[in-house]
């Protein structure tokens, strides 16, 4: 019976449902052994168990697939087992059991030869594949160990890096703390050195400056008698005076009880004795001239006096009189309303513009009249002088506005608030023009029927004097309160002062004008006969020549 190399197809009996049955590996091995050795020559079970122990156990593919699905972590081992089993079946010829096995088993004997050859081939292939499977398992184990070692190495590296980072952080913190401590030490050392230098400078200045006696000019710094400074005796003026102080009580009731706040008055000693020097406020004493320098206590504690023998003595009555005079003479500052304040500012501006110009215009008219000028010439001269004085007035205003750097503002004293400067200027200019035109207009229109020059001058003098006295009284009113005790005296003084000024100005101007007119006529500098000009009044009666000057 010839052996063929092709695979033997063995068919098993089909089930009732028509599905084929897959034979297990152990059953297949038993079947092959029975085909190879025969039914009677099958080796004992012990030998087969040894062979099974040495050989790898067959693995069912369905079980392997289920394990792969259930546990993904054992994929490598399952794949190796599946590869080993597939190699077992792939190297040998596949065996397909297609034959139907009858209950008698007659077909088994006819095909024993071919099955024996297939069994031998399968054993040889399984024996050759066993070491390959073991090698793969070893390799997989080694790979797992290598991976574990790498993971351990990575963990150790990460731990070492973390430790190094922590050490670096700790080192930086320590360095920062050390740096702060060094800076604090440097600052302390610098401050100590500065204090030492300041002390040295202070000691040096103390050595350079010494105290000298104001009486004998001797250096008394090294010979100073230091004494404690004690407070003097104080008396409360609102209460009854002590009986040990001699005070003469007046018959009339005193005003001491009516004082609102009590006044503490210093009662000095009558004489400074050697045993009573500690009671005074002595600071130092000159040993050469016996000069004693002390601070007076009580109401004049800020005054420093140096004396010989005894201090300045004052009685209690003097201090009370001073206090009473202070309370009666001084009045609290009055707050004026805006309307009254604005009216006072207008009066100030009127006085500032008209007072001086009235006196100036009076002098011009009196001097021109004394020189023999006509009425028309006097009026023209007065108006020209008035126009030229406006420039001077503007310059005075500019000086007042620029005088804000001084401690006492002259602008506010003479005119008022700076915010109302435009109104002040307007009122002052109007007053300047009005009071400046009064003397020439009075001279022109007074005694126009008679035309006597002396009468005209008297009328101009009286009109100007009234204007000046009025402006002087306004000046007193805006500078002093009306309810003061000396207001009447102030008005009288102002009237007398400005009357004297008007008289002096008018008299001096008249005298100088008369003298200059006579002197010019004597020199014949402007004589009418020399220049062949006839007078406009030539051949006219005196009664008809009264208004020829106009």
From Swiss-Prot:
Q: Which residues form a coiled coil?
A: 134-165, 393-418
Q: Which organism is it from?
A: Arabidopsis thaliana (Mouse-ear cress)
The Acidic residues compositionally biased stretches are 143-152
Question: Which parts of the chain span the membrane according to its record?
Answer: 374-394, 425-445, 458-478, 500-520
Q: Which family does it belong to?
A: Belongs to the CCC1 family.
Q: Which UniProt keywords apply?
A: Coiled coil, Endoplasmic reticulum, Membrane, Transmembrane, Transmembrane helix
Per the record, the major location class is endoplasmic reticulum
Q: What does this protein do?
A: May sequester excess cytosolic iron and manganese into endoplasmic reticulum to reduce metal ion toxicity. Not essential for the accumulation of ER body components, including PYK10.
Q: Could you tell me where the Basic and acidic residues compositional bias lies? A: 153-166, 185-198
**InterPro entries, alphabetized:** ER_body_metal_sequester (IPR052843)
Membrane topology type: Multi-pass membrane protein
Q: What is this protein called?
A: Membrane protein of ER body 2
**Induction or repression:** Induced by NAI1.
Query: What changes when the gene is disrupted?
Result: No visible phenotype and no effect on pathogen sensitivity.
Describe, as the record does, how this protein assembles with itself and its partners.
Interacts directly or indirectly with NAI2.
What segments bear the compositional bias annotation Polar residues?
Answer: 122-132
Q: Where is the composition biased (Low complexity)?
A: 80-105, 112-121
Q: Give a yes or no for keyword Coiled coil in this entry.
A: yes
A single GO molecular function term of this UniProt record: manganese ion transmembrane transporter activity
Could you give one GO CC term from the UniProt record?
ER body
PANTHER family, sorted: MEMBRANE PROTEIN OF ER BODY-LIKE PROTEIN, MEMBRANE PROTEIN OF ER BODY-LIKE PROTEIN ISOFORM X1
- Give the start-end ranges of region Disordered: 46-199
User: Which superkingdom is the protein from?
Assistant: Eukaryota
Where does it live in the cell?
A: Endoplasmic reticulum membrane
């Amino acid at each position: 019976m010839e052996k063929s190399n092709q695979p033997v197809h063995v068919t098993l009996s089909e089930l009732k449902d028509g599905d084929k049955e897959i034979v297990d590996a152990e059953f297949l091995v038993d079947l092959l052994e029975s085909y190879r050795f025969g039914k009677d020559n099958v080796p004992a079970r012990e030998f087969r168990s040894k062979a099974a122990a040495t050989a790898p156990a067959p693995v069912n593919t369905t079980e392997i697939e289920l394990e792969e699905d259930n546990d993904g972590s054992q994929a490598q081992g399952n794949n190796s087992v599946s590869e080993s089993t597939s190699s077992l079946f792939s190297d040998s010829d596949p065996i397909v059991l297609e034959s139907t096995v009858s209950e008698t088993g007659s077909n088994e004997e006819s095909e024993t030869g071919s099955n024996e050859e297939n069994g031998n081939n399968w054993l040889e292939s399984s024996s050759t594949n066993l070491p390959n499977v073991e090698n793969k398992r070893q390799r997989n184990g080694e790979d797992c160990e290598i991976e574990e070692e790498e993971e351990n190495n990575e963990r150790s590296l990460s731990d070492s890096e973390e430790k190094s980072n922590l050490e670096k952080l700790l080192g930086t913190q320590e360095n920062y703390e050390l740096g702060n401590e060094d800076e604090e030490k440097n600052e302390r050392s610098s401050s100590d050195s500065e204090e030492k230098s300041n002390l040295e400078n202070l000691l040096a200045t103390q050595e350079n400056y010494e105290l000298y006696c104001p009486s004998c000019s001797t250096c008394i710094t090294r010979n100073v008698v230091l004494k404690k400074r004690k407070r003097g005796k104080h008396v409360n003026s609102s209460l009854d005076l002590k009986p040990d102080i001699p005070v003469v009580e007046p018959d009339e009731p005193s005003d001491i009880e009516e004082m609102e706040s009590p006044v503490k008055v210093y009662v000095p000693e009558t004489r400074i004795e050697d045993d009573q020097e500690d009671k005074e406020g002595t600071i130092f004493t000159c040993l050469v001239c016996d000069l004693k320098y002390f601070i007076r206590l009580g109401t004049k504690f800020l005054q420093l006096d140096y004396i010989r023998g005894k201090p300045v003595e004052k009685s209690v009555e003097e201090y009370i009189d001073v206090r009473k005079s202070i309370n009666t003479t001084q009045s609290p500052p009055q707050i004026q309303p805006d309307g009254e304040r604005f009216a006072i500012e207008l009066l100030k501006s009127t006085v500032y513009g008209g007072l001086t110009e009235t006196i100036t215009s009076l002098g011009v008219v009196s001097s021109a009249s004394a020189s023999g000028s006509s009425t028309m010439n006097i009026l023209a001269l007065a108006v020209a002088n008035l126009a030229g004085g406006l420039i001077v007035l503007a310059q005075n205003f500019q000086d007042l506005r620029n005088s804000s750097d001084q401690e006492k503002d002259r602008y506010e004293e003479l005119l008022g608030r700076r915010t109302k400067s435009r109104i002040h200027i307007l009122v002052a200019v109007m007053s300047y023009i009005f009071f400046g035109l009064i003397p020439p207009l009075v001279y022109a229109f007074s005694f126009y029927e008679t035309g006597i020059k002396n009468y005209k001058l008297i009328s101009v003098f009286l009109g100007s004097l009234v204007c000046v006295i009025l402006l002087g009284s306004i000046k007193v009113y805006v500078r002093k309160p009306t309810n003061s005790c000396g207001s009447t005296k102030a008005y009288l003084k102002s009237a007398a002062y400005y009357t004297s000024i008007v008289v002096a100005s008018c008299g001096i101007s008249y005298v100088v004008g008369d003298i200059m007119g006579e002197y010019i006529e004597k020199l014949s500098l402007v004589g009418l006969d020399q220049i062949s000009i006839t007078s406009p009044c030539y051949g006219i009666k005196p009664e008809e020549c009264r208004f020829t000057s106009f």
